[in-house]
Amino acid sequence: MPRRLQQRGAGVKGPPASTSRRSHPASASAPRSPPAATTKPLLRWDEVPDDFVECFILSGYRRLPCTAQECLASVLKPTNETLNFWTHFIPLLLFLSKFCRLFFLGGSDVPFHHPWLLPLWCYASGVLLTFAMSCTAHVFSCLSLRLRAAFFYLDYASISYYGFGSTVAYYYYLLPSLSLLDARVMTPYVQQRLGWHVDCTRLIAVYRALVLPVAFVLAVACTVACCKSRTDWCSYPFALRTFVFVMPLSMACPIMLESWLFDLRGENPTLFVHFYRRYFWLVVAAFFNVSKIPERIQPGLFDIIGHSHQLFHIFTFLSIYDQVYYVEEGLRQFLQAPPAAPTFSGTVGYMLLLVVCLGLVIRKFLNSTEFCSKK
């Protein structure tokens, strides 16, 4: 059976032998019909190349190769990729409308090109790009094996780009308001609670200096790991990708520590509620992405509607929705008493450099002979 119908190492039994490609002796003598889309628009798992088969998804596959026009038309047909597209295309439109209101229709005295909004531009570009690339990858994944790999490499890169853009927004809009990163608060706090006579000024300065460079390195490393997970050495690609994309979330640890050490719920209830609700949605999304429930329980029943990747999309959308909410609130507080304006090199410059690095990573993997398609 194809290696993609079950997760390697998971010990999951596949379909019975009667469904195998080699169990159709009658089909050998029967005349073959031309592979026209009108003859058989949707295929089963044993009628497509192994590299296109998804875990526990038995039907709903588009014929291969498709043309670009056929790929676009398939978003209105009941395939196993249709809702993968719509569960991110609708959020893309919602967030596009949201950011247009923030930048152009917010009624603020700050123009859209003001340096104070540069971190928001970085964050917005990451959110919109990750949804756009996800839609593109799911729609055009059946053009060819190489293009499928290329689109999903770009999908992984866009997620890393979004993660770094989130860190830029946190760095300028959220972290400065935390007591945890205020030496005037932390120095007496450490002395009172731990009895340590430590001046936290230097430690906090070092942390601030390292946040963006470390997040940058993590973004590149996560993309490399996810691209590598599409090769045959990786037994659990979904678990690996989930883990590596959890790593950049560590950049938000100061907010979590703030809620433990200080009264974040009382001082900033919006941040507290939406921050923890976001991480709840992320945990739920990770559960579905790794477990492959519900299609693992009943293969074939959720091929078109309700399989785990669609649920993963929905819960990641909810997590980003909560994040946008508290980033917007952080922006409002930032504009009330802004410190020094963010620089172009410290915001957009970082993002452009990241684009170059991620492009080089994708180019390296596409030029290698060892690539394989695993969503």
From Swiss-Prot:
Subcellular localization, as worded in the UniProt entry: Cell membrane
Stretches the record annotates as Disordered: 1-39
Keyword Cell membrane appears in the UniProt entry: yes
Residue ranges crossing the lipid bilayer per the database entry: 85-105, 115-135, 161-181, 204-224, 242-262, 300-320, 342-362
Biased composition (Low complexity): 15-39
Keyword entries, A-Z: Cell membrane, Lipid-binding, Membrane, Receptor, Steroid-binding, Transmembrane, Transmembrane helix
GO cellular component: plasma membrane
The keyword Membrane is assigned to this record: yes
Pfam families noted in UniProt: HlyIII (PF03006)
UniProt GO molecular function: steroid binding
Segments on the Extracellular side according to the record's topology features: 106-114, 182-203, 263-299, 363-375
Recorded topology in the membrane: Multi-pass membrane protein
Topology, Cytoplasmic side: 1-84, 136-160, 225-241, 321-341
Function per UniProt: Plasma membrane progesterone (P4) receptor coupled to G proteins. Seems to act through a G(s) mediated pathway. May be involved in regulating rapid P4 signaling in the nervous system. Also binds dehydroepiandrosterone (DHEA), pregnanolone, pregnenolone and allopregnanolone.
Misc remark: Non-classical progesterone receptors involved in extranuclear signaling are classified in 2 groups: the class II progestin and adipoQ receptor (PAQR) family (also called mPRs) (PAQR5, PAQR6, PAQR7, PAQR8 and PAQR9) and the b5-like heme/steroid-binding protein family (also called MAPRs) (PGRMC1, PGRMC2, NENF and CYB5D2).
PANTHER family: ADIPOR/PROGESTIN RECEPTOR-RELATED, MEMBRANE PROGESTIN RECEPTOR EPSILON
Protein family (similarity comment): Belongs to the ADIPOR family.
Subunit structure, as described in the record: Homodimer.
Name of this chain's protein: Membrane progesterone receptor epsilon
Source organism per UniProt: Mus musculus (Mouse)
Lineage of the species this protein comes from: Eukaryota, Metazoa, Chordata, Craniata, Vertebrata
Encoding gene per record: Paqr9
